[in-house]
C-alpha cells in the first residue's frame, strides 16, 4: 500500500507569491501589447484582452487573501 506524502505547507506563501508575480507580469505584458498594437487590434480582441486582465486582477486579489490566510496559520 502506498502512503500519501505528508502535507508540507512550509513553502506555500513562496509558491503563491511566485504565482502572483507571474500573473502581474502577464498582466503588464498584456497592457503593453494592447498599447503598442491598439490600432492593429479589433475591438473584440481588445475586449478579450481587457477581460482577461480583469480576471487576472481578481486572481491576484484572491491569491493575496490566500497568502494572508497562510501567514496567519503559521
UniProtKB/Swiss-Prot annotation:
It comes from the Bacteria. Induction: Expressed only in the forespore compartment of sporulating cells. Pfam families: Tlp. GO terms for biological process: asexual sporulation; sporulation resulting in formation of a cellular spore. Disulfide bonds: none annotated. The keyword Oxidoreductase does not apply. Keywords: Sporulation. Its main location: other. Coiled coil: none annotated. The keyword Transcription regulation does not apply. Residues 38-74 are annotated as: Disordered. It is found in: Spore core. Belongs to the Tlp family. NCBIfam families: SASP_tlp. This is Small, acid-soluble spore protein Tlp. The lineage of its organism: Bacteria, Bacillati, Bacillota, Bacilli, Bacillales. The gene is tlp.
